[in-house]
Amino acid sequence: HSPKWRQQLGSLGGGNHFIELCLDETDTVWMFLHSGSRGVGNKIAQKHIAIAKKLMAKWWIPIENNDLAYLVQGTPEFGSYIKDLHWAQRFAFLNREEMMDRFSTCLSEFMGTDVEEVERINCHHNYTQREEHAGHTVWLTRKGAVNADEGRLALIPGSMGTASYVVEGKGNDQSLHSAPHGAGRRYSR
């Protein structure tokens, strides 16, 4: 993992990551932040994608596009990937928790009173997990998407100048219980 992960815990990062105060239609104040694993997850993914590409060639597994290389479940390489993946996802979760704690403290100090936190919604937007779909247990990757199980709350961040949203999942089977995580990018990173 990144040698700087300890210094990165509790930090926002760049790109489309942000912290903001929002008002909803009832004038309720929301502390909203959008961030992730600070690049650690991407580095882990690149490492394991390179391993998958080598294994595809070694095992003579034909694939139409080298970018579709995969790790075979049950292999040591797959196990290593899942272990690293869970570490990165936990780091991203704790990173957002730490920032939200700091945000709440700063807002309390600014307002001169305690902030009443009613609920906290912390959701991944780039991740993989085991789920049940259409009677099968699968490894589902959501890239730029959030879990939209029926009743589950999620966040859809806007872009500069557009609103962010708290949404409730509908559990749509056709979308694999997924929803877009944001407006997307105009240009590639």
Can you name each region flagged by the protein language model?
Residues 1-189:
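Domain-length cofactor-binding catalytic modules of enzymes
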